[in-house]
Regions:
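Pocket-forming structural segment of enzyme catalytic cores
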Residues: 1-51, 117
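Acyltransferase
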Residues: 45-118
């Protein structure tokens, strides 16, 4: 994710898509099609506390030029144990998606489900 970027302007050029969440600092986070049948999530909400730390130090040890992940280590200091503040948000996002975009929109008889391709 740190080596790629999805530009909001590019997404907004596609009439079938809409940006659901984004920020000035981290960019586009969640994109959905207008039917709410397809979702695209950037970032790694599934990461545990130390995954990003392990990736960061792996790349540092390889001598790669890499920035310290913002807001991950206290005071952006890699010698400190990382924060772990996203788990509840990640679980809530998944639960809400499952409830509101899958269960509420899925017919009881799956034969009634419209195909994705028109």
């Amino acid at each position: 994710s740190r080596h790629t970027e999805i530009r909001r302007d590019d997404v907004e050029k596609v009439p079938e898509l809409r940006v659901l969440t984004s920020s000035n600092e981290s960019g586009v986070h969640i994109i959905a099609d207008k039917t709410n049948r397809q979702f695209f999530v950037t970032g790694h909400s599934e990461y545990d506390r130390f995954t990003l730390k392990n990736e960061y130090f792996r790349d540092v040890e390889k001598g790669l030029k890499i920035d310290v992940p913002k807001h991950y280590f206290p005071y952006d200091d890699p010698s400190q144990p990382p924060h772990f503040i996203w788990r509840c948000h990640a679980n809530l996002m998944f639960s809400n998606w499952l409830n509101y975009c899958v269960y509420q929109e899925t017919p009881y008889d799956l034969n009634d489900l419209a195909p994705l391709n028109k």
